[in-house]
Every structure is written in C-alpha cells, then in structure tokens.
C-alpha cells in the first residue's frame, strides 16, 4: 500500500474532520478479512504478532479453556477465542481471532481527551501514539468491542496497530503473512468485501444459510471484517456484538455537547474579564481594616 495512504485524517481531542464520503478514496482504504470457517485455531497469528511487535506477555495459568492467553492485554494484542455452541442438534466449535476492529468511526478516538494520542490514517487504520497517552482509560470505555488495554507498568494503553509500519511500506500484517490456512486476507477494502461475498456464497452452498460478512454499520463499518457461518448470531463467537455502537455519553460529550462546553468556558472567561475591568481585582482586607469599618 502506498505511503500516501498513511496521511492522517483524524486526531483525538482536535477538530480534525473526516472527509465527506463522496470524496473519500475507497480504493486507498485497507482491510483485513478473517474467514472463521477456515481458521484452525493454531495461534500462529498470535505468535507472529508477538514477534513482530516485540511484546512478551507473562506466562499465565490454565483456566480450563483453549484460550491462551485468556484475554487481551497490553502485551497480547490478538488472541484466539474458542466457543462451543449447539446448532440444529449438532455441536459446533467456533473459533475467532480477536483484536482491534479499526472502526471507520472509532469510539476510542472520540472518547480520548489527549491531543494526538489516537489517530486515524486515510487508509482506515486506527493507531495509538503512546507518547501522547495520559492513561485516563477513556478509550477503553469508548470502544464498543472492549479492545484497548492499559499497561500498569507505564500507564499507557495499547492495542493492535494492524501493523501500520509494515503496511506503510507495502507489506501485509504479520498475522496475515503467517496464517497457514489462508484464513486471514489483506488488501483494499473493496477487494476484501468482494472476497468476503465469494466466501459467503460458498458457505451458503454448504448449507450455512445465515452465513454473512461482519462489517457493522453502527461504527461506520470496520477495517477488520469477518466471514461468519452464523452472521445472524455473531454473539456466538465469544460475544462478538451484534450491533456495536459508540456509547451515547461519548457521542454527546464529544459531539453535540462539545460546542456547549466550549461556549460555557468562553462565557465564564469573558465574565471574569468584564468583572476585572468594571470592578477591578478583589482586594484583601486585613483584620485591623475590617475592625475599623465596623
């Protein structure tokens, strides 16, 4: 992918605006497609992520499931999720690669109060700039997928970057390169949507009538998409939300109420200025002067 697609179009806690849809270059937008029907849960993608990003999580404890590590962390940016479900009287073992979805309308970026701590590139990748992170955790609350994780060692938040450093020089993400079954694909979003529809058609031909593409509209679509056997029940895949949306409080705080808050601050500041000009500064009165007036 060309370097020019790395132009930043959004920064947290700034007034940068997303270009209108009619002028966005969809050919420049990238996406990762994960076909859960061909994933074997080998965790090669987890290892590749750890190796490329030079992150090492602590050795955990067995909690009675195949998930290892048991959850995402500041040092585990992707994990395999294993779920058992019964469909039509048959047991199904569903596997899903979990990690940042790189939303087109990222709740983490909207919620973040630190200027430039979270950015979004023109190609759709959402990236954390750790040097600007203040560790407030608002991005965690703003994410409808519960992805960002706080590192207690440096009090900064981390997540999958979609290997933005590799993508910027024309390489695919490390997890895509290492997948032995070709379950993970990478390219332009247009290409990935076309490929996803082909995979869905094959799944439906095999009897999965509810197969579909997971690209939720509630967050403007995502740059990490899934092909699911049971797209009508995404929650079967370890709680994947059916209709994820940015929390109303975040939308109000950083949306409709933001101008009001700014106006309130300006009005307060102006009031202080007028008070100073019209009345002058408050004077301190000592005890002797106060007794004299009495």
From Swiss-Prot:
GO MF annotation, one: formate dehydrogenase (quinone) activity
Cited SUPFAM superfamilies: 4Fe-4S ferredoxins
Keyword Cell membrane (UniProt): yes
Keyword field: 4Fe-4S, Cell inner membrane, Cell membrane, Electron transport, Iron, Iron-sulfur, Membrane, Metal-binding, Repeat, Transmembrane, Transmembrane helix, Transport
The protein's required cofactors: [4Fe-4S] cluster
Subcellular location: Cell inner membrane
Residues in the Cytoplasmic compartment per record: 280-294
Residues that coordinate or bind [4Fe-4S] cluster 3: 100, 103, 108, 143
Inducing stimuli: By nitrate under anaerobic conditions.
Origin: domain of life: Bacteria
Positions with a binding annotation for [4Fe-4S] cluster 2: 49, 160, 163, 175
Pfam families: Fer4_11, Fer4_4, Form-deh_trans
Positions of the 4Fe-4S ferredoxin-type domain: 30-58, 91-123, 124-153, 158-189
Cofactor remark: Binds 4 [4Fe-4S] clusters per subunit.
Residues bound to [4Fe-4S] cluster 4: 112, 133, 136, 139
Membrane topology qualifier: Single-pass membrane protein
Nucleus keyword on record: no
Periplasmic-side positions: 1-256
One cellular-component annotation, GO: membrane
Function: Formate dehydrogenase allows E.coli to use formate as major electron donor during anaerobic respiration, when nitrate is used as electron acceptor. The beta subunit FdnH is an electron transfer unit containing 4 iron-sulfur clusters; it serves as a conduit for electrons that are transferred from the formate oxidation site in the alpha subunit (FdnG) to the menaquinone associated with the gamma subunit (FdnI) of formate dehydrogenase-N. Formate dehydrogenase-N is part of a system that generates proton motive force, together with the dissimilatory nitrate reductase (Nar).
Protein's UniProt name: Formate dehydrogenase, nitrate-inducible, iron-sulfur subunit
Organism name: Escherichia coli (strain K12)
């Amino acid at each position: 992918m060309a370097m020019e697609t790395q132009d930043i179009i959004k920064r947290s806690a700034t007034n940068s605006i997303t270009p209108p849809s009619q002028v966005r270059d969809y050919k420049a937008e990238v996406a990762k497609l994960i076909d859960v029907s061909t994933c074997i849960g080998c965790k090669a993608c987890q290892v590749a992520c750890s190796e490329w990003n030079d992150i090492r999580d602590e050795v955990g404890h067995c909690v009675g499931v195949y998930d290892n590590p048991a959850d995402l962390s500041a040092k585990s940016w992707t994990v395999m999720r294993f779920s058992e479900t019964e469909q039509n009287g048959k047991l199904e073992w569903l596997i899903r690669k979990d990690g940042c979805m790189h939303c087109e309308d990222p709740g983490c970026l909207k919620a973040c109060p630190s200027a430039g701590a979270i950015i979004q590139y023109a190609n759709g990748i959402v990236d954390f700039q750790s040097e600007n992170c203040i560790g407030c955790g608002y991005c965690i609350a703003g994410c409808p997928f519960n992805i960002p994780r706080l590192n207690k060692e440096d009090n900064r938040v981390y997540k999958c970057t979609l290997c933005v450093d590799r993508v910027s020089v024309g390489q695919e993400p490390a997890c895509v390169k290492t997948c032995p079954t070709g379950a993970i694909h990478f390219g332009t979003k247009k290409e990935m949507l076309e490929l996803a529809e082909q995979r869905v058609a094959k799944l439906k031909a095999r009897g999965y009538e509810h197969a579909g593409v997971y690209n939720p509209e509630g967050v403007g679509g995502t740059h990490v998409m899934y092909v699911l056997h049971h797209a009508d029940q995404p929650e079967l895949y370890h709680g994947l939300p059916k209709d994820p949306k940015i929390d109303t409080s975040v939308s109000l705080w950083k949306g409709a109420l933001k101008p009001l808050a700014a106006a309130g601050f300006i009005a307060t500041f102006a009031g202080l200025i007028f008070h100073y000009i019209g009345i002058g500064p408050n004077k301190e009165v000592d005890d002797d002067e106060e007794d004299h007036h009495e």
